[in-house]
Amino acid sequence: MSLLDTAAARPRGRPAPAAARRDRRTDAAVVAGLILVALLAFGPYTLDGGFYSDDWNFAADYQVASVDGFIAGVGNLLEISVSRPVGTFYAALRAELFGLDPTGHLIVSAALGLGVALLLYAVLRVLGMRPLHAGPIALLVLLFPLADSVRLWSSGSAANLAICLYLAGLLLALEALPRRGPLALAMHAGSVLLYAASLMSYEFTLVPVLLSVLLYWRRAPGRPALWRWGADVLAMAAVLGLATAQTTLEREPLSALPERAVEVSAGALSVISWSVFPLGDTADVSPARVIGGLIVIVVLGAALLRVRRGRGAELRPWLLLAAAGTLVAAAGYVVLIAAAGYNPAHRGIANRVNVFAALGIAMFVYALVMLAALQLGERLRRPVAPIAIALTALLVVGYAVRLQSDQSSWRDAADEQERVLDDLAGTPAPPAGGGLAAFRVPAFAAPGVPVFHQSWDMTGAARLLWDDDALQAYPVNNGRSVACAAGGVAVTGEEDDAELPYGRTRFVDVASGRSTRIGSRAACRAWLETREPRS
């Protein structure tokens, strides 16, 4: 097989024994290579990362209920995340196994990221792609830094769990398609269960499940593909109905969907531009983003022009792969249009929205590499393989550098959290079941990388610190403010509207260690008027 063998050609029956043995050895080498890269890329981080955002909330809520057993702990978490029951069970299981030590949680998160890469590799191989090409695509997915929060943040790893379940279901469905009889039905029933579990972990996989019929048809064209896809659709409709009835996610009104579609598309284009030219940021238009966009336009445009002139038959498979990657990426982004506030270009914990699209983006980028290598090789009269390897290596280095930079930011956030909690531990505890307003607490260590940025992470950490499962704590940052109302301390913010009772609330300036019990409206005003720390 040459370098140019791709997934565009349908698998032609069972390979010869020698070829099969060679493929097995190559598959084993690719798997070993991906495992090694995962250990090098994520192993050190698992030892010094921390809890972030929802991690604190889940840890505190599970701990208080789990004294009555694991099931009680699961039930308590379901009260705050009932629309994603499999993801919630996963969070409870991690809490039961690893407790308050982030290391075990982060090892599982990294393992799920590796699992996505390995399962994608397996799917591409089943669909006929040679290891030489499926391997680099899986490697790009493993390192893809614009969705790295799902590998660096324990709660975010539920998104990778969802993708693992989806890809496992897809593999099972593809293996079942050529078969007939009870075994085939049982295998597809298993795939439907995996799809359902995936959707009950995270919603990103809904559209991919509905589009899986395209792969079914490619694997085994005909009525069996349609019948089995029909079973998928019915199951997804039932699960989606349950999730929609229980969700607390803010949805955009229909009138806002066109504007949201433009916003999501612009963010996605910025992510794709960065993926091709991994320099700079994705948050705004910059020279780097323009260069990335021009690379896409020039390479695709030149390839399409050659094909149109009938001189680029070798380019067609890669154009098809680029189109398939675009479809996969779009399938990952469609669900964002109706969800308020999510943008693919955002950083930190918000980049989890790119997690499924990353599979398609990696396919698209690798197709672009091959299109560029083929055209450059012909123009320069040089072998294609070294050019393709060099271009892929440049991308891998760019991804790895950004990943290491992001990991440094997440480590900084963990260090800042430790400092904040040490400072809080040195102040008197709020009255039992009372409230805490913490001033001069850093919200983020880097864009989107939280220290304590919401009530749920501050509350979870404070409850664990003082062993008080009724305490409410608010960091006065990230647009949040306090006011001295008649009945108590009013806390307002984008996610908050609460009132903390006088006499059972403390104000703490984390930077100075100043701490005061707020017993009255006058005491509240005195604190704010004398010195209102800002963060």
Model-derived regions: residue spans:
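C-terminal luminal/periplasmic domains and tails of membrane-associated envelope-modifying transferases
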Residues: 21, 425-434, 441-535
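Membrane-lumen/periplasm interface segments of multi-pass, membrane-embedded glycan/lipid transferases
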Residues: 61-96, 233-310, 336-344, 348-351, ...
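Juxtamembrane segments of multi-pass membrane glycosylation machinery
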Residues: 89-111, 116, 121, 279-284
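Transmembrane-helix motifs of polytopic, lipid-linked glycan transferases
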Residues: 107-128, 168-172, 301-302
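Transmembrane-helix signature of polytopic, membrane-embedded enzymes
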Residues: 120, 124-146, 163-164
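Short hydrophobic alpha-helices at membrane interfaces in multi-pass membrane enzymes
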Residues: 172-196
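Perimembrane helix-loop-helix junctions
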Residues: 207-237
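Signature aromatic-anchored transmembrane alpha helix within multi-pass, membrane-resident enzymes
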Residues: 368-401
